[in-house]
Structures are given as C-alpha cells and as structure tokens.
Amino acid sequence: MGRLEGKVIVLTAAAQGIGRASALAFAREGAKVIATDINEAKLQELENYPGIQTRVLDVTKKRQIDQFASEIEKIDVLFNVAGFVHHGTILDCEEKDWDFSMNLNVRSMYLMIKAFLPKMLAQKSGNIINMSSVASSIKGVENRCVYSATKAAVIGLTKSVAADFIQQGIRCNCVCPGTVDTPSLQERIQARDDPKEALKAFLNRQKTGRFASAEEVALLCVYLASDESAYVTGTPVVIDGGWSL
C-alpha cells in the first residue's frame, strides 16, 4: 500500500516543474490527484498517468476557484504551487510587477485556502502545503526583491493558518527550496543577456555544486502530504543544499 493511499490531493501549477513532479509522486504513492494548471496543453500530458485527473484553473480568478471547490466533495491535501519569479531589485520592480507577483504568489494561495479550508474543517482533518522559497524571510537574495517579499508572505500565511486551526485537525506547512532545475529556471537563464554566464552564476552559489531536481523536492512533498508528518505543522521546511547556511 502506498504512503498516500486513499488521499485526495488537489494541487496547482501541476503542468511542469515541481508541481508536475509532485503530482506524479503523489499518484505513485496511491493518492487520487486532481492536478490543476492554466496551461491546458501541458496539463493534458498528465492524463495518461493512473490516479491523476486534470482541471484547467486560473488561480488568480476567485470565481473559478470557488466553482472548482464546490465540485470537490472530499479533500485531504491542498498543495499550492503556483508562482512567478520576478528578476530585479526594488528599482526594477514597477507597480504592475509588484501587483502581478503578489496576486499570483500570495493572493492565489489565500483564495485556494479560503475555498477549501471549510471542507477540511467539516471533515475535522486537512493538510495544506504551500510553496515558499529560501529567497524569503530566510535569506536575502540579490535581484529577487518582490519574489522574496511574496515568499516571506507565504511563510507568514502558513504559520497563521497553522496557528488558527491546529486544534481543529488542520495542518499547514510550506516548502522552501533553493534553486531547482525546472523549465522556469531554464527560461530565466535563457532570458538573460549572457545565458552561459547566468548559468555559471546560478551554479556558483550552490554549495553542493548542483541544482536540486524537481523530483527531490517532490519527495519532500510526499512526506508532508503523508501521515508520517502528522506532528509537523506551521513549519517552513528548507530543502536548499545548504545554500542558506
């Protein structure tokens, strides 16, 4: 029997990167996975895997989220993954950049939690996992101003939800990766003026000499989604290869 046998898991940003790796890892451990993303074409690739059903969802749209939540009868785990990495200092961050990042990286989690938490409370059990980052209140990182601000907010949101509902059977934790080799990272590297130098700079700050893989982060997410972590709540769980040391 899998470590997540019988659990219903809803996750966002499942079409690629950590979201995709986690959806596959959850399904392998026996969960019924409801994988959502705004990218319908990429999302459909998951439909070939047993235990995974897909749903196109824009997590910045409250009406879509509320409609989606109304269709879900049971949920054991909510995994909020959706996010965007803005490059630059505060001087490079226009108001529209700030608003976009806050909307996608923080408000979407607020909307998802608010939509699904009442179902968990009615069940008297529930598990929420939010994607944060080491680039947050944990570590100051150059050229990650608004991104770090949003991910620090995610840590605060996580702790608040955990504290408010701990006695009602709800757990809430967040995952704080360092640099992970994902399509998003590769896109950011290629967008730089000198991609080779950008890749070198990313690698030079890795104390292990390499990036994390999405699959490594997904294994941590399996643990947090499972009953093995039943005594863990309100915790920012770091997986960064020692970058924050």
Swiss-Prot record:
Entry EC no(s): 1.1.1.-, 1.1.1.30, 1.1.1.104
Its biological purpose: NAD(H)-dependent dehydrogenase/reductase with a preference for cyclic substrates. Catalyzes stereoselective conversion of 4-oxo-L-proline to cis-4-hydroxy-L-proline, likely a detoxification mechanism for ketoprolines. Mediates the formation of 2,5-dihydroxybenzoate (2,5-DHBA), a siderophore that chelates free cytoplasmic iron and associates with LCN2, thereby regulating iron transport and homeostasis while protecting cells against free radical-induced oxidative stress.
Subcellular localization, as worded in the UniProt entry: Cytoplasm
Substrates-to-products reaction catalysed: cis-4-hydroxy-L-proline + NAD(+) = 4-oxo-L-proline + NADH + H(+); (R)-3-hydroxybutanoate + NAD(+) = acetoacetate + NADH + H(+)
Record-level GO cellular component terms: cytoplasm
Single GO biological process annotation from the record: siderophore biosynthetic process
Name assigned to this protein: Dehydrogenase/reductase SDR family member 6
Keyword NAD: yes
One matching Pfam family: adh_short_C2
Organism: Rattus norvegicus
Quaternary organization: Homotetramer.
Keywords, alphabetical: Cytoplasm, Lipid metabolism, NAD, Oxidoreductase
Pathway it works in: Amino-acid metabolism; Siderophore biosynthesis
